[in-house]
């Protein structure tokens, strides 16, 4: 099994520069402590050698056993960990551009990451908190990225990965063996696996749900795709061509929101029906991208559009907007503190 060594933080600038994504514009992590009124950069490296402000962030997540610990993955310089609420960061995996990661729900030292390395899509795992990493999946062809990875929370040895070419691949033994579950011939943007089932966000096709660990799937956005069901209120066009990110309420799995190229849609019945959510966007806005729902209330939602972060506290009737001043970059990831709902985090992608 191939081993991957951690790159020293001192080599960070070289790693990032080699990926052509490390520019002078502001990216990295932003944090709000006042419910989204304003956002501040939170990018200091733990050893004082610099910051992660130049990194393009792909995902942010809390340690499932300790919410003061956060992890952030980057498209250009690996995986980072903070033990003090994003005040300081340390690199625990370099060398591989990471698109997604997931932490074992009962063992925080076990972390799975997915992305691309040496021109191949790969999935890696550490079982010692990042001291060593092993490859558990390597794509058969070049130019294929592993875009998403998820664990079954009820049986974490079950792993799902989604490829850029559309293959959904499953393992029942922690990554020792794999089987092809579905082939969508369309990019898989995200896999979410919760106690209610597995959700696969396929870029131009829609959202699929499985309640039997990936043996069968139902398209839950079929009603949204039907002619006439997309809202005439959308300022971005008349047909959905990109399902971007899905957020499911932590307290009610039937409540979910999806960002698309036409705007924001929500369902209160697990995807049986969908409603368009009007946001204060302009014709010059980008389509909504990142989205997060607060644990404390599924009426509290953060949504990004370009470098603007919108917040609603009433499920989408009224919105406030905060300019993150991220130099026109894209807010690509959002996360709300499960214990302190006034605290939230944003990951910036440098465009």
Regions found by a protein language model. Give the residues of each.
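Extracellular glycan-interacting surfaces
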Residues: 2-351
